[in-house]
């Protein structure tokens, strides 16, 4: 619930449009639970961003006065190939921010949709296992610029480490390593594997030599800033 205010900037009485499938964690967290707990209306949309035409999402933003939108880079890349008139024909004045997650957001895609919408485009990184963002820009906590090509900084509640997967050594800027989280995990994250606590520990917490840390199994490079 706190992420709705501190990360996504949603307010009670507003509308959120998350284009995810309800069978995926983003659908659970940000079509159902997050917006409704925060007193927002939510749009549940079934279909592609191209049917009946490439303006369908933007028509919903206009019709329901969407303030916060959450989608995926792949969907934006699909829309980038379409006639730009489908985007410009709708009134998107209520939309404050477009959030994107689910895969790496490349700079050309981010720059294109930012220029087309003339709205902030904010990346964020997380997993099914965490249920909410791990890395993000948290304007409800601290005002900071976002940088295309980066999902942001560690979210409150996460003690993030970038580690050498072979030695467990902590890495510095411009070094590639595995993204890890020191325990305890914050509320919202998985607590075990159903009926098999040992599998949970062995799979997620015992993969980095000499460290009892949660491994995301994802790789990253930390910027100097």
Annotate each language-model stretch with its function.
Residues 174, 180-225:
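Conserved ATP-binding/catalytic segment of the ANL
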């Amino acid at each position: 619930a706190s992420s709705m205010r501190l990360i996504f900037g949603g307010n009670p009485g507003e509308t959120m449009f998350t284009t995810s499938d309800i069978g995926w964690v983003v659908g659970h967290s940000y079509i159902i639970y997050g917006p409704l707990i925060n007193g927002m209306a939510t749009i549940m949309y079934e279909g592609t961003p191209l049917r009946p035409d490439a303006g369908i999402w933007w028509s919903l933003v206009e019709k329901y006065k969407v303030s916060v939108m959450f989608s995926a880079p792949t969907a934006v890349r699909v829309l980038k190939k379409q006639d730009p008139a489908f985007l410009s024909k709708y009134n998107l004045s209520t939309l404050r921010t477009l959030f994107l997650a689910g895969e790496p957001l490349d700079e050309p895609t981010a720059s294109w949709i930012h220029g087309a919408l003339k709205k902030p485009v904010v990346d964020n990184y997380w997993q099914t296992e965490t249920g909410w963002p791990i890395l993000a820009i948290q304007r409800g906590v601290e005002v900071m610029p976002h940088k295309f090509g980066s999902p942001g900084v560690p979210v409150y509640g996460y003690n993030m480490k970038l580690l050498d997967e072979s030695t467990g050594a902590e890495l510095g800027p411009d070094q590639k390593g595995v993204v890890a989280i020191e325990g305890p995990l914050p509320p919202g994250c998985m607590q075990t594997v159903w009926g098999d606590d040992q599998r949970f520990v062995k799979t997620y917490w015992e993969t980095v030599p000499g460290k009892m840390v949660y491994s995301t199994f994802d790789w990253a490079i930390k910027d100097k800033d």
